[in-house]
From Swiss-Prot:
PANTHER family: MEDIATOR OF RNA POLYMERASE II TRANSCRIPTION SUBUNIT 5
Domain of life, per lineage: Eukaryota
Job description of the protein: Component of the Mediator complex, a coactivator involved in the regulated transcription of nearly all RNA polymerase II-dependent genes. Mediator functions as a bridge to convey information from gene-specific regulatory proteins to the basal RNA polymerase II transcription machinery. Mediator is recruited to promoters by direct interactions with regulatory proteins and serves as a scaffold for the assembly of a functional preinitiation complex with RNA polymerase II and the general transcription factors.
Cellular component annotations (GO), alphabetically ordered: mediator complex
Name of the protein described by the UniProt record: Mediator of RNA polymerase II transcription subunit 5
Protein family per UniProt: Belongs to the Mediator complex subunit 5 family.
Keywords for the protein's UniProt record, in alphabetical order: Activator, Nucleus, Transcription, Transcription regulation
GO molecular function: transcription coregulator activity
Subcellular location: Nucleus
Main location: nucleus
Disordered as annotated region, ranges: 1109-1131, 1202-1226
Length: 1237
């Protein structure tokens, strides 16, 4: 049995145990049984590994990885981890099935190997650290000291921390009496430095500003303990074996070039990481600083020894160019390109193709990223054109399109099946599988239809051929092949039923008895259930038929099991498109009539079971909301807001499915504009109307993590709906109220900073809430919703303070604040509750009597006699300083009257509150003392499943992306681990480039294509110029020689995608036109002004930047034609600036910019090489030769380094210099290389 199979079995056991909520002893017993079966299978296979208890290591790796992938930690996982290390807590005597599986050092190594230094992982890291902390202390304080030279420890260290690109899939072996200084010993040196760097990641968390109270974290303390007891000894051991190898006469005992290069790279990385940690460390931590300085000295010695080895090998450099050229020719057929053709006519049922990383990332963009549909469609067009451009000349356009459709189907089916297979990580995560099912059945046919329509309208595209058949011919061929080869995965999509048995039966059918036995081993240990089935095949085929992309007769006659498929399609309930045909209407017209008249919940249910209509429904719903807004029909808007809110909060998938096809801002901006109306709250007699709308607006912002910078001012043509002074330029340039409110929604403003009018309103509301007169109509008229949103935290603060000071008692407080549970005020409840949760965490816990005494309230509250012994404010004498706030929290949240959307909106703050409470183990038991209604367990049960966001669903299910994109072959792919967790930023770009420069990633074709696709598809959704920033931050001189070819290949792939994007955007760019107008206006103004405005004028002309400025020139990208709902006519004119235009999501990077930036890097590197006159000049010259060889190889291989002129010629009207080939060869990198040579 292979290592991968063993890990899969352990992973399945863990997931099933969690799904069935097995107790710790039962889980441990099953794990012991599975480990014994795996060991027996390995003995039968003759498999042997030098690492003792390898199965225990696999179990530790599985559990640690799963914990680190969870945003919400299941307490059962903590019990499982404790049992794994220490055995069952309930065992008596010595029981073989209740003892530990592995040791604490093994779990610690897996934590260090898998942890990412991101704040989102901190809760999981802390949980693991708390479990292993005591065990580490016991290990290091044991009578027998821990030996870093232990063969098992070194073997596991190398397995986890050695760069897999330098390994040949061989498990290292170490003799028991480890004094040998052979070549196998030296292999552990780079892994030791990687171990130190991993510890530094944990230590850096102690100064992370994004973490609350980082100085209290356990993880940095664990890392310090490990560095003291293991790190120092390990580096001393490495120094010893390197010194021995240096003095050895046998060259075979010296490190080879690959290990030496990796060692020097890791030494440089380690020193950089240590310096970064030292800069952020508290100066008071003198012992820790001294430890890091000591490690710096040890690593410096290792680096010096490595450098001496490198200098001894410089004589071999002269032979490298010839050898490299031979290697390049040998690997030419395996070079990463955008060409990926699969002949669907010859594919067999057993030939399931691997999903290419760029296609997997494209699916991630389409489903998980909430940006405009035009942006997503552009990405589809770009990848197809890149595929077509790189295809063989003999390949017809028909076959390219069919293969591309087949590729999209396979990727969507595989991703959907991977998501369905994963048990939900938390309550509410089940919706993610439904979203993917809807995307597979509704989005893929829509994409194919729109791609075909785009090809119909753009005959001038560089496609090298024509389409001779109708679209249905191509998609039918792709569908036939996809249904054939993806049959098992489609079964998973329809029902995740008994996958272990199914896999075992398939393996047995194919004659793979051993594989079948391994697959069914899991089912022998633990049975599986049977969830309901979903008609995925029927939905997909019906959507294709209704989009005129497939024919019913072709499905019945030409598909495998065609008559059964056709019968399943016929058995579906009548589709909405059929309703439209029977009424003689187009589908969008049908929705235009039904959205205003049908009950929203019933129509949503009908649409949910008809995925082929989701795109039209989403677009029509946005148009309808805009129409209602023009008519000031807030009641209709409120009905749909309430229905969509309930759908999202009750586990439905329709809101998330709608957001696949529209940018959340398209729905948010019109609704947010309601808050800017001058008569808001005065034109409607129904309080629930505004409450439903405003709660839905807040939910949209929360669920889709909408940054306030994306909320723009929106106006309608109806003048009655205009905002206050909407004609004034100042108000047009001001941000909408919602944008400012979200930034300060939980702020309780002091009375002293409020205006006289607001202070009067606060006083009137306090009297209305707690007086006898109640809330009058005059008070409502004087308090628009925007004011209540802003003042609600202050009202809570004043009310709670009044109760604490004895002005009102607790019952009166409850009665007054219960108004916020009613429709009249519920929209203001989220901000007030977030303030309340923060206030509870901020308030020190102390007895109420001490608190009142310190506040000078002894006489007015404490000394007042009462018949029942309570205080004057209604609190018992054993209450605490937090009791009033906790009672209010229980009143408003732990009740059926609390709107479900409110719980969603406060979930993040509630999680922070619970974490703060549970972190203080001494204060937590005293929290509820003196409270009548507060119960933390009951509150947590109420909040279970609340707070689900689209990003949380995507991150929780991100394992599908890593496994699918990595081809299911390299589950430890560092690149895809980074890409699935990184958010595009300067820091993220630096991490990627650092890994590339050292050769840790980017060596194989999948990594190269995956990173290029991420830069061109995923990152631009947040940072439009990510690809250009990537090249800008590359320093060629810092790249390891062995990594240069991979970096050059990635840049070449990026250029290929950008050129394809330029080819598919044939129109001019409005953003570029606006930039040009600004530059001309600035130039005109500068002619009649003094030199005092010279800097401003220069800043407005980025196109005139000097070549040696790292900032790219202003591009002239084509504009993606908006063929759907546009804001052009509705968006209010705003004051534009060059900065805002450059940051626009519509701005695109051009191939000319990337090539010019790459040429700049070449010039700088060449100048640096010529200026070096020391011992490093030989190494730099070798790098330059390698760089030249890599670029020349790509140029000779037909890459588009100097061919970008043809695309720019068509899209930007750049005429060639001499025309044809000569012009191209003189304008690209080839000319630069010739000149510099």
């Amino acid at each position: 049995m292979s290592t991968g199979e063993a890990q899969q079995l352990i992973q399945k056991l863990l997931l099933e145990a969690l799904a069935r909520r097995l107790a710790q002893p039962k889980w441990l017993s099953l794990l012991h049984q599975l480990v014994r079966r795996i060991e027996a299978a390995q003995d039968d296979d003759g498999t042997f590994d030098v690492i003792p208890s390898l199965e225990g290591s696999h179990a530790a790796e599985c559990l640690v990885k799963y914990l680190l992938s969870q945003s919400f930690i299941d307490p059962l996982l903590i019990e499982y981890l404790q049992a794994l290390i220490y055995g069952s807590a309930n065992r008596s005597g010595v029981s073989p099935d209740q003892g530990p599986i592995t040791d604490v050092m093994t779990v610690t190594l897996h934590l260090l190997a898998n942890v990412q230094a991101a704040a989102s992982n901190v809760p999981a890291i802390e949980i693991i650290s708390s479990v292993i902390g005591q065990g580490l202390l016991m290990t290091f304080q044991a009578p027998v000291p821990f030996r870093v030279s232990s063969p098992s420890f070194l073997a596991l260290l190398q397995r986890l921390f050695a760069d897999p690109t330098y390994e040949q899939d061989q498990t290292p072996s170490f003799p028991v009496d480890h004094v040998d200084t052979g070549a196998s010993d030296i292999k552990v040196a780079p892994a030791s430095l990687g171990f130190v760097v991993a510890n530094l990641r944990l230590l850096a968390l102690a100064a992370d500003p994004a973490i609350a109270s980082p100085q209290n974290l356990l993880a940095p303390r664990v890392s310090i303990t490990v560095l003291i007891n293991v790190g120092q000894g390990l580096l001393a051991y490495v120094t010893q074996i390197l010194s021995a190898a240096q003095t050895a006469k046998n060259d075979k005992l010296k490190p080879d070039g690959a290990i030496l290069q990796q060692l020097r790279s890791m030494a440089s990385t380690s020193l950089t990481e240590i310096e970064a940690v030292l800069r952020s460390m508290n100066p008071a931590w003198k012992d820790e600083i001294a430890l890091l300085r000591s490690l710096t000295s040890q690593i410096g010695v290792i680096d010096q020894i490595s450098e001496s080895f490198a200098e001894a090998n410089t004589s071999k450099l002269s032979t490298r160019p010839t050898k490299r050229k031979l290697e390049t020719l040998q690997d030419a057929q395996q070079r990463a390109t955008w060409d990926h053709f699969l002949d669907v006519s010859t594919i067999a049922a057993s030939e399931k193709p691997a999903v290419e990383p760029e296609t997997a990332l494209l699916m991630h963009l389409l489903v998980d990223h909430h940006t405009s549909w035009d942006f997503k469609l552009d990405a589809i067009k770009t990848l197809f054109l890149a595929r077509r451009s790189a295809a063989a000349p003999s390949l017809t356009l028909e076959k390219s399109l069919t293969a591309f459709y087949f590729e999209l189907l396979v990727a969507a089916i595989d991703a959907c099946a991977a998501v369905v297979e994963m048990p939900p990580a938390f309550k509410g995560a089940e919706v993610y599988a439904t979203i993917w099912r809807n995307a597979l059945c509704g989005m893929i046919p829509e994409l194919v239809l729109q791609l075909e329509q785009w090809l119909d309208g753009n005959q001038e595209l560089p496609l090298r051929g024509q389409r001779l058949e109708a679209p249905h011919v191509r998609l039918e061929a792709a569908l036939r092949a996809a249904l054939l080869v993806m049959s098992d995965r489609l079964n998973v999509c329809e029902s995740a039923t008994n996958q272990s048995h199914a896999h075992g039966n398939v393996a047995a059918t194919n004659g793979e008895e051993a594989a079948g036995a391994h697959a069914n081993m899991m089912s022998d240990v633990l049975g599986l259930g049977t969830p309901p089935s979903q008609p995925i095949r029927a939905w997909l085929l019906r959507a294709c038929i209704e989009h005129s992309l497939a024919r019913p007769e072709a499905i019945a006659d030409e598909f495998a099991n065609g008559h059964k498929l056709a019968s399943e399609v016929q058995s579906l309930t009548q589709s909405l498109r059929m309703d439209a045909q029977l009424e003689g209407l187009a589908l969008n017209t049908l929705f235009e009539t039904r959205i205003p008249t049908d009950h929203p919940v019933e129509l949503l249910q009908r649409v949910a079971s008809d995925p082929g209509t989701h795109f039209i429904f989403a677009r029509q719903l946005v148009l309808q909301v805009q129409g209602w807004l023009e008519q000031h029909d807030l009641e209709s808007i409120a009905r749909w807001c309430k229905a969509l809110t309930e759908n999202a909060c009750e586990g439905g998938a329709m809101l998330d499915t709608i957001m696949i096809y529209i940018d959340p801002a398209q729905m948010l901006d019109p609704l947010a504009s309601i808050l800017d109306h001058q008569d808001l709250g005065q034109t409607s007699d129904e309080p629930s109307t505004l409450s439903d709308i405003l709660l839905f607006v807040q939910l949209l912002c929360y669920r889709y993590s909408t940054p306030i910078t994306r909320i723009s001012r929106y106006t309608v043509s109806n003048h009655d709906m205009d905002t206050v002074d909407s004609s004034a330029p100042l108000h047009r340039s001001m941000p909408p109220f919602l944008a400012t409110h979200l930034a300060t929604s939980s702020v309780s403003y002091p009375l002293s900073v409020l205006s006289e009018e607001d202070r009067g309103l606060v006083s009137r509301w306090i009297h209305a809430l707690f007086g006898n007169e109640g809330i009058s109509d005059d008070l409502i008229s004087a308090s628009p919703p925007t004011t209540l949103l802003r003042l609600s935290p202050l009202l809570f603060s004043q009310s709670i303070s009044a109760c604490q000071h004895g002005i009102i008692d607790l019952e009166t407080l409850r009665g007054g604040l219960s108004y916020f549970l009613q429709d009249l005020l519920s929209f203001a409840l989220p901000g007030a509750l977030v303030w309340l949760l923060s206030e509870i965490s901020r308030t020190p816990l102390q007895p109420i009597l001490d608190f009142l005494s310190e506040s000078g309230l002894q006489a007015s509250v404490v000394d007042v006699p009462s018949s029942d012994g309570t205080l004057a404010n209604g609190l018992p004498r054993n209450a605490t300083s937090k009791s009033v706030c906790l009672e209010v929290l229980a009143l408003l949240v732990d009740t059926d009257a609390c709107p479900s959307s409110v719980r969603q909106l406060i979930a993040k703050a509630f999680d922070a509150f619970v974490s703060t409470i549970e972190a203080d183990v001494t204060a937590a038991p005293q929290l509820a003392v003196g409270c009548e209604t507060f119960n933390l367990a009951s509150l947590k049960a109420r909040m279970e499943g609340a707070g689900v966001t689209a990003r949380l669903l995507s991150e929780t299910g991100a394992s599908w992306l890593q496994s699918v994109a990595a081809g299911h072959q390299d589950s430890r792919s560092k690149l895809f681990s980074m890409l699935t967790t990184l958010q595009p930023s300067v820091h993220a770009m630096d991490r990627l480039i650092g890994a590339l420069k050292s050769g840790q990633v980017g060596r194989n074709g999948r990594d190269q294509k995956g990173l290029a696709a991420w830069l061109c598809f995923i990152a631009p959704a947040s940072e439009p110029t990510s690809a250009l920033r990537f090249v800008q931050r590359l320093e060629l001189g810092d790249i390891e020689e062995s990594a240069i070819e991979g970096v050059v290949r990635i840049v070449g792939l990026v250029v290929g995608l950008i050129m394809a994007a330029e080819a598919q955007r044939a129109t001019t760019d409005a953003v570029a036109d606006d930039l040009l107008a600004l530059a001309r206006a600035a130039d005109t103004n500068a002619r009649g002004t003094k030199a005092t405005v010279a800097d401003t004028t220069a800043a407005a002309r980025p196109a005139e930047a000097d070549l040696f400025d790292d900032e790219p020139c202003s591009p002239q990208p084509p504009h993606a034609a908006a063929n759907a709902t546009s804001h052009t006519s509705n968006a209010a004119p705003t004051v534009t600036s060059a900065a805002s235009l450059l940051a626009s999501g519509e701005l695109r990077t051009t191939s000319k910019q990337v090539l010019d930036m790459m040429a700049l890097k070449l010039v700088r590197f060449r100048s640096h090489m010529l200026g070096e006159k020391n011992a490093k000049s030989t190494t730099i010259s070798a790098k330059w030769a390698t760089l030249q060889s890599a670029i020349a190889d790509h140029l000779a291989g037909g890459e588009a380094w100097h061919g970008a002129q043809q695309c720019r010629e068509r899209t930007q009207n750049d005429a060639p210099v001499n025309g044809g080939k000569d012009a191209d060869s003189g304008s690209g990198l080839s000319a630069w290389l010739s000149a510099m040579s």
